[in-house]
């Protein structure tokens, strides 16, 4: 390994990105678009990109636009539903579509490799849940983002919308659904590779696969660049040192241990709660072809957000697939290919109490996970039959999904389980990490714009970067939720370039 006196200047980069998933790939693409001269290094512990949570079969949900995911509009004490989170997620997904459209327009991205249209449907079948869905529909329908949402309780129409859900169902059972035709499925594994390949081929991005971060330390010696991070990598050829003024930790569940290792004070506020997942995957191609929508149901009480049950049309490696789940479970690993010691190794004096407080105050979640762990194959099949009454056990196989690490955050009120994602950045903006899970990938562009705002603020405010950003995201300084004309303009452009229909 190189030491200070013999440090090779070629091993100094403008940015080191850890984890070759959709987040780091999006950040690499944005940074290169804003400054083609930046030297960027991507480090990945596995042998190829997008093998953890970004992979199509590992992702808990794809194409999240809050059209059908009922957990983004929770019921409130007065009987109405909260809509702010749904609007924010929808706006973020429109921003992703806008970015992909710009790259597609220039011929720099083939969106047909990862983006497919699939209707987004919410379906429920108990009086209580139907009342909830009706309230949700009545409120969202009034918002520009969801104005084209449709409602139905008509058996024949519902059969057209979701034939597998309605086939064999008791005609006396009340069923209601909402539908948005302009929904999508996104293969984020394919998108990750589509971002990275041209950057690698052009020499704008250096990649180290089969390599992990062994040490991460801020350099403050007088004879060195003041702002640099010293990153020691351990790969097939041993250890080596690289340096950079900026480090991004986008390694999914692996981001928390690296954030803790960085020593920045902001890391002390966080702990992680890992949740694993399982899918039932349909092996009958004819059945998969009949289902042309994502059908989301209502989550059980206490269920984490990545465990909302759905019958999911999903493209995996270019092939239409049909999945049901995900069923939640528990593993102390922070990554699917991680270590059982990940959770205990993350415990610190600063986060032990918040973790215990979350365990004591989230009994419903703990009980839910225990019940999920106890599920037999028969019970999982019965859950599938609630969605698809004619489902046969022999047509479905069990597949392990990706690992999620929910955020536990220390606050004045004690530890709390925080849903969603959060960017944690050092005070000087030299290091950022992304923690959390759903909706994640679908909002990657918005999340990485936040990283740029917090870590590259001076350059982001420059005329050069603003002009380039405006070219990539024409509506970047406008709010589509507040101005329906802006939303319509965004959607018309994206739909034309991406081949989406309303």
UniProtKB/Swiss-Prot annotation:
The keyword Oxidoreductase applies. Pfam families: Mqo (PF06039). GO terms for biological process: tricarboxylic acid cycle. It is an enzyme of class 1 (oxidoreductase). One of its GO terms (molecular function) is L-malate dehydrogenase (quinone) activity. NCBIfam families: mal_quin_oxido, PRK05257.2-1, PRK05257.2-3, PRK05257.3-2. Belongs to the MQO family. InterPro entries: FAD/NAD-bd_sf, MQO. This is Probable malate:quinone oxidoreductase. Its EC number is 1.1.5.4. It catalyses: (S)-malate + a quinone = a quinol + oxaloacetate. PANTHER family: L-2-HYDROXYGLUTARATE DEHYDROGENASE, MITOCHONDRIAL. Pathway: Carbohydrate metabolism; tricarboxylic acid cycle; oxaloacetate from (S)-malate (quinone route): step 1/1. Keywords: FAD, Flavoprotein, Oxidoreductase, Tricarboxylic acid cycle. Its cofactor is FAD.
């Amino acid at each position: 390994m190189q030491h200070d006196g013999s440090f090779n200047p070629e091993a100094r980069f403008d940015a080191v990105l850890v984890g070759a998933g959709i987040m780091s790939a999006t950040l690499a693409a944005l940074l290169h678009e804003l400054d083609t001269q930046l030297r960027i290094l991507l480090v990945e512990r596995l042998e190829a990109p997008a093998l953890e949570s970004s992979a199509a079969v590992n992702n808990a949900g794809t194409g999240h636009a809050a059209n059908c995911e009922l957990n983004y509009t929770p019921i409130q004490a007065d009987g109405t539903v909260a809509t702010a989170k749904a609007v924010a997620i929808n706006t973020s997904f429109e921003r992703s579509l806008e970015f992909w459209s710009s790259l597609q327009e220039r011929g720099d991205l083939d969106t047909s490799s990862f983006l497919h249209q699939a209707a987004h449907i919410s379906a429920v079948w108990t009086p209580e849940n139907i009342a909830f869905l009706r309230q949700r529909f009545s409120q969202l329908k009034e918002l520009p983002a969801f104005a084209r949402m449709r409602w139905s309780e008509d058996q024949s129409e519902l059969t057209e919308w979701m034939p597998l859900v309605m086939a064999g169902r008791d005609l006396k059972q009340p069923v209601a659904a909402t539908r948005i035709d302009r929904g999508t499925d996104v293969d984020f594994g394919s998108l990750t590779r589509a971002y990275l390949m041209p950057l690698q081929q052009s020499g704008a991005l250096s990649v180290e696969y089969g390599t992990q971060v062994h040490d991460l330390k801020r350099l403050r010696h007088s004879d060195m660049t003041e702002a640099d991070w010293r990153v020691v990598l351990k790969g097939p050829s041993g250890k080596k040192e690289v340096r950079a003024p900026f480090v991004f930790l986008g390694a999914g569940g692996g981001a928390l241990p690296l954030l803790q290792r960085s020593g920045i004070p902001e890391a002390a506020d966080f702990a992680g709660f890992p949740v694993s997942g399982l899918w039932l995957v349909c092996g009958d191609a004819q059945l998969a072809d009949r289902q042309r929508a994502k059908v989301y149901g209502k989550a059980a009480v206490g269920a984490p957000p990545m465990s909302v049950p759905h019958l999911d049309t999903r493209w995996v490696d270019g092939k239409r697939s049909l999945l049901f789940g995900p069923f939640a479970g528990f593993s102390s690993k922070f990554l699917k290919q991680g270590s059982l010691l990940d959770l205990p190794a993350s415990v610190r004096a600063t986060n032990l109490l918040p973790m215990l407080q979350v365990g004591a105050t989230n009994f419903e979640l703990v009980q839910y996970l225990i019940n999920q762990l106890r599920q037999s194959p028969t019970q999982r099949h019965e859950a599938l039959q609630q969605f698809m009454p004619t489902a046969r056990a022999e047509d479905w196989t069990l597949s392990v999904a990706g690992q999620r690490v929910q955020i536990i955050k220390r606050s004045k009120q004690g530890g709390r389980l925080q849903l969603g994602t959060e960017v944690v950045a050092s005070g000087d903006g030299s290091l950022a990490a992304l923690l959390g899970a759903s909706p994640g990938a679908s909002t990657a562009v918005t999340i990485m714009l936040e990283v740029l705002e917090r870590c590259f603020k001076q350059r982001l405010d420059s005329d050069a970067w603003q002009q380039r950003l405006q070219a990539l995201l024409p509506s970047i300084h406008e709010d589509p939720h507040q101005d329906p004309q802006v939303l319509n303009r965004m959607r018309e452009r994206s739909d034309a370039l991406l081949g989406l229909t309303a």
